[in-house]
UniProtKB/Swiss-Prot annotation:
Domain tr-type G: 343-510
Family recorded in the similarity comment: Belongs to the TRAFAC class translation factor GTPase superfamily. Classic translation factor GTPase family. IF-2 subfamily.
Name of the protein in its database record: Translation initiation factor IF-2
Residue ranges of coiled coil: none
Cellular component annotations (GO), alphabetically ordered: cytosol
Keyword Cytoplasm: yes
Keywords: Cytoplasm, GTP-binding, Initiation factor, Nucleotide-binding, Protein biosynthesis
Length: 844
């Protein structure tokens, strides 16, 4: 506690210096002037003296109880109370002024810390005061209270003070019981009552003078304490106990709490409700923020990460972006540091235009009749084959050449090391040839050109070389880096040179792979077979795939139950650059998905579910964007767009994907193709039920409907169509779309009549006497009136007569009378043109 002068203490307590010096002298502290300083020991002595100055006051209270009749009983209760004794007598006016006046500003001390303000409190004159330690911040006196210095850290404890005061009350009440009688019976009750009233009036007047201006209303805490000391008696004078004082609610002040700043983890595609739950706010608040940002959203709508980040920052929280690929990177990353690389066989993809002899060339190399098994001689899906030659093994991928199989060609180019571009010597470069060149260059794969069908009389290999050179495929003989080989798939001419070129190119590439460790690869093709389940053709690229391994292919997972090579033989292990068929997946994977072996089946299942959920969210987001784009594209268009709904079932994933893309490309502004469902396997009853509900046509490509589905289709009238060749399927769909088109209305002139003379008729008005100069005039057809080759009226005929007889038709070179309905301004020299409206079918 720092030292303080007498003048500073007098200024803070609003006392005169002389008065304060007298009080200090009465407490044994000798000070002569206002400049004298008070040491901490003297301040402590002053506070102790103030707290010890107490006095005990006994108060007597008499109450009157009524009995039966006119009898009364006077009850006298005495109560003691300890009251702080005044240091000196002061006038009431001064007391009131000291209560109202507010303390002055705090006085600076040596340590530059403000001394807390000192206030006077008259309540201390009435209420008993407990002795408090020096460390308390507030110590009450008769006329003032002194706050502690700032360097002493003290916290006031109200609850302890209340407990002490309650203990004092209990001790006082016990003393009252011992010293004063409980009941006093007297006959002179009236005299006692008048005496009691005088005492009460004197006490009230004293209390009013002492209370001051700031305490006109009674303190609830004082009332409750007084009520607790009163004892109640029944009508017979027996004690009932103390009256219960009502509980006084204390007004508490709650400090304002800062809003908690949370760190929100944001994943891609998070919904509005999920984001609201993570921020512990209502979903409507998020919707409001989005609305202010100009985005109309519902509580179940998905948000992209950027929008969610803006919302979190707007609401004052922090964020962390969730790494969607964390689990995938941890599971699919294979440690190859302990494994050694070995040379592997090249993976060669045969590409080119349709019917240029790709599969026939591969057939000659494999010495097997593959083309005979393909419908129409057209490759419907990728075939993966491993061929052993005298100079080494080669893995071949045969891709379709039809334009519908663009994605399959791109997939083949991505999975390959070398591309054999087959070009027919008689056809030259065709559209799919150019597309194959683009796929190979995009994948960065070297090209070996095979000029096929050189055995034909009209073959012109030099023409092919020139056309390819125009497309930046330069042969080595011209100074380029592309090897050319003239071959004949029918006779086998030049096939050996082609294989030598492929093996030479593979040596230049120095192809290597890891033969050990967990296998990695790519799905070439997949299908659903009856009795075997999902079957996937997989090309192993690294490691060894073994029977019993846990694999993950896209969104599907499973254990390898069986493996077969390209010849159909069951094998146990497949090394790099080996195509195999595997069984045991949970579903049919998409062609082009990566295949990876995972040691933990639980993690494989979890990752597959995560990929499936991500795919579903992406699909929903795409549908929402498509709906919005369709809404804007359809604005201002008249009429409704016709829709051809199709349910597509196929034998393999690649064919279904290719047909789906081809059919969707047929959509126009007037007719739209909608593939409402597609899948692999036979047509089932559920497909027929879906077709009935959606009024769709079922198309099967290399699949048939089972017996139950056939019966249900006959009953419900659902159309089933089967195809083996993609050309026929696309042509029939085009015809069906043409049938849905609304026909064009075309006007055709069938006759012209010249007005030679005009007659007046009371019945029909003006009658034109005409000569038919072209075609024929028919009674029921619409007409136009032309004057100087300008249409002045369009309507119908009211009458057509040949002489006096009605006629339905008047041919060229004959005269007739024509009455035009609702038109009388026909003049000589006008022409009456007769026409008819015919429907013309639209074409796609």
């Amino acid at each position: 506690m720092a030292e303080i002068t007498v003048g500073q203490l007098a200024q803070q307590t609003n006392k005169e210096v002389s008065t304060l010096l007298k009080q200090l002298k009465s407490f044994g502290i000798e000070k002569s002037s206002e400049k004298d300083t008070l040491t901490p020991e003297e301040m402590k002595t002053l506070l102790d003296k103030i707290n010890s100055a107490k006095n005990t006051v006994t108060r007597k209270k008499v109450t009157s109880l009524k009995l039966d009749g006119k009898h009364k009983i006077n009850v006298s209760v005495k109560k003691k109370r300890r009251v702080a004794k005044k240091v000196e007598e002061q006038s009431p006016a001064k007391v009131e002024e000291s209560i109202v006046e507010k303390p002055q500003a705090a006085v600076d001390v040596k340590d530059n810390k403000a001394v807390e303000s000192v206030e006077r409190n008259s309540v201390n004159l009435v209420q008993p005061q407990q002795e408090k330690p020096v460390t308390k911040p507030v110590i009450k006196d008769n006329g003032f209270k002194i706050t502690a210095m700032p360097e002493v850290k003290i916290q006031e404890n109200n609850s302890q003070d209340e407990e002490k005061s309650s203990e004092d009350k209990s001790t006082e009440s016990k003393n009252n019981k011992k010293k004063s009688p409980k009941k006093v019976f007297t006959e002179s009750g009236n005299n006692t009552n008048t005496k009691y009233k005088r005492e009460e009036e004197e006490k009230k007047s004293k209390a009013k003078k002492a209370s001051g201006k700031g305490f006109k209303k009674a303190n609830p805490r004082q009332l409750s304490q007084l009520a607790g000391d009163l004892e109640s008696f029944d009508e017979f004078g027996s004690k009932k106990g103390k009256l219960k004082a009502p509980k006084v609610k204390k007004q508490e002040f709650t400090m304002p709490v800062e809003s908690a700043v949370k760190t929100i983890e944001i994943r891609e595609g998070i919904t509005v409700s999920d984001l609201a739950n993570r921020m512990a706010v209502k979903g409507a608040e998020i919707v409001k923020v989005l609305f202010n940002m100009g985005v109309m959203a519902t509580i179940n709508q998905s948000l992209d990460q950027d929008t969610a980040v803006l919302i979190v920052e707007e609401m004052g929280h922090k964020y962390t972006l969730h790494n969607e690929n964390a689990l995938e990177e941890a599971v699919t990353t294979v440690d190859r540091s302990l494994h050694k690389k070995i040379s592997r066989a090249p993976v060669v993809t045969i590409m080119g235009h349709v019917d240029h002899g790709k599969t026939s060339l591969l057939d000659y190399i494999r010495k097997a009749r593959v083309v005979a098994g393909e419908a129409g001689g057209i490759t419907q899906h990728i075939g993966a084959y491993s061929v052993k030659t005298s100079k080494g093994a080669i893995t071949f991928l045969d891709t379709p050449g039809h334009e519908a199989f663009t994605s399959m060609r791109a997939r083949g180019a991505k999975s390959t090391d070398i591309v054999i571009l087959v070009v027919a010597a008689d056809d030259g470069v065709m559209p799919q040839t150019e597309e194959a060149i683009q796929h190979a260059k995009a994948a960065g794969v070297p090209i070996v050109v095979a000029v096929n069908k050189i055995d034909k009389p009209d073959a012109d290999p030099d023409k092919v070389v020139g056309e390819l050179a125009q497309r930046n495929v330069i042969p080595e003989s011209w100074g380029g880096d592309v090897m050319f080989a003239n071959v004949s798939a029918k006779t086998g001419e030049g096939v050996a040179e082609l294989l030598d070129a492929v093996l030479l190119q593979s040596e230049v590439l120095e192809l290597e792979a890891f033969a050990e460790g967990l296998a990695e690869g790519v799905v070439i093709e997949s299908r659903l077979e009856k009795g075997r389940g999902p079957v996937a053709t997989v090309l192993v690229q690294n490691g060894s795939l073994k029977q019993g391994d846990n694999i993950l292919c896209g969104t599907e997972y499973g254990r390898v139950r069986a493996m077969h090579d390209d010849l159909g033989k069951q094998i146990k292990v497949a090394g790099p650059a080996t195509p195999v068929e595997i069984l045991g997946l949970s579903g049919v994977p998409a062609a082009g998905d990566d295949m990876v072996v995972i040691e933990n089946e639980k993690k494989a299942k979890e990752l597959a579910a995560q990929r499936s959920q991500r795919q579903k969210e992406a699909k929903i987001a795409q549908e929402q964007s498509l709906k919005l784009s369709n809404m804007f594209s359809n604005m201002g268009k008249e009429g409704e767009q016709q829709t051809l709904k199709i349910i597509l079932k196929g034998d393999v994933q690649g064919s279904v994907e290719a047909i789906r893309e081809s059919l969707l490309k047929l959509s126009t502004d007037e007719v739209k193709v909608d593939i409402i469902a597609s899948g692999i396997g036979a047509i089932t009853s559920s497909d027929v039920t879906l077709a009935v509900a959606s009024t769709a046509v079922i198309i099967g490509f290399n699949v048939r409907a089972d017996s139950a589905a056939k019966k249900l289709a006959e009953v419900d009238g659902v159309e089933l169509r089967y195809y083996n060749i993609i050309y026929d399927l696309i042509d029939d769909v085009k015809k069906a779309m043409t049938g849905l088109l609304s026909p064009d209305m075309k006007e055709q002139i069938i006759g012209i009549a010249e007005v030679r003379e005009v007659y007046r008729s009371s019945k029909f008005g003006s009658i034109a006497g005409c000569m038919v100069v072209e075609g024929a005039v028919k009674r029921t057809n619409p007409i136009r009136v032309l004057r100087d080759n300008v249409v002045i009226y369009e309507g119908t005929l009211e009458s057509l007569k040949r002489f006096k007889d009605d006629a339905s038709e008047v041919k060229k070179g004959m005269e007739c009378g024509i009455g035009v309905k609702n038109y009388n301004d026909v003049r000589e020299g006008d022409q009456i043109e007769v026409f008819e409206v015919i429907e013309v079918a639209k074409e796609l």
